[in-house]
Amino acid sequence: IADRFLKWFRNAEYTATEKVFDIGRTTLQALAKYELKLNKASECGEDNEYSNGNGSLMRILPIAYYCFYKNLENKDILEIVSRVSSITHKHSLGILGCYIYVQFAIELLKGKSRKNAYENIKKLDYTDFTEEIVNKYERILKKDISKYKLEEIKSTGYVVDTLEATLWIFMNTKTYNEAIIG
């Protein structure tokens, strides 16, 4: 996967326009470490609290399909999500965001309704993460993100804000056009 990230970054592979744009600082640093062979792929991501952009969250969705079709247990899903996220974003806050998102997608792949999928991710075991980290996702895991007003949803590059916005939009719109154009 890290090799493919490098192909994307260096050669614009997998892009719609044959141009790379808006690569985050954390992703850039991680890919540089990997390219210079300074670390194993899963150890290249920064793990400080200031390295919690949404880069790994934006790339993690294919892992949901893999885990679903392999019928993996939650502990194995967390391990894979952690390893893939850690290529660029190794902090537990970003890993948890990716895990929540992957689990939500898996619930949808199982045929659950949006509401049931959302309720099911709130019931998962998050004890592999500190209470402080889990509490950063309080509006998703302990409250109901879909009930917030649009003005209360932030649109930033911070992983928590991005996941909140993603779930809010998905839970509050019915069509693609409504979600994108709003």
Locations of regions flagged by a protein language model:
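Structured, active/binding-site neighborhoods that engage oxygen-rich ligands
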Residues: I1-G182
